[in-house]
Amino acid sequence: MPRMVRCSFCGREIEPGTGIMYVKNDGSILWFCSRKCYKNYLLLRRDPRKLKWTLKYGSQTK
């Protein structure tokens, strides 16, 4: 049974068989639900807590 994973950028759940899996050189795996999340995280280096369209918007870890 495939498991649901969460997008590493926006926090939304990704259906099995969809999305982008990115493996870093250190072996950690990043999942992205769309090309939009992929570009914002890896290419533009944006913080998901500062973008209103993400589920992580406004959450501060203290």
From Swiss-Prot:
Q: Record's PANTHER family?
A: 60S RIBOSOMAL PROTEIN L24, RIBOSOMAL PROTEIN L24
Give the cofactor binding note: Binds 1 zinc ion per subunit.
| UniProt keywords, alphabetically | Metal-binding, Ribonucleoprotein, Ribosomal protein, RNA-binding, rRNA-binding, Zinc, Zinc-finger
**Which SUPFAM superfamilies does the record cross-reference, listed alphabetically?**
Glucocorticoid receptor-like (DNA-binding domain)
Its biological function?
A: Binds to the 23S rRNA.
Q: Which cofactor does it need?
A: Zn(2+)
Please give one Gene Ontology molecular function term for this protein: rRNA binding
UniProt key word tRNA processing: no
* Residue spans, zinc finger C4-type: 7-37
Subunit record text: Part of the 50S ribosomal subunit. Forms a cluster with proteins L3 and L14.
- Quote the protein name from its UniProt record: Large ribosomal subunit protein eL24
TM region(s), chain numbering: none
Write down the SMART domains for this protein, in alphabetical order. TRASH
Question: A Gene Ontology biological process annotation?
Answer: translation
Q: Name one GO cellular component term.
A: ribonucleoprotein complex
Annotated residues for binding of Zn(2+): 7, 10, 33, 37
Coiled-coil positions? none
For this chain, the family text in UniProt reads: Belongs to the eukaryotic ribosomal protein eL24 family.
Q: Which HAMAP family match?
A: Ribosomal_eL24
Q: Which Pfam families match?
A: Ribosomal_L24e (PF01246)
* UniProt organism field: Staphylothermus marinus (strain ATCC 43588 / DSM 3639 / JCM 9404 / F1)
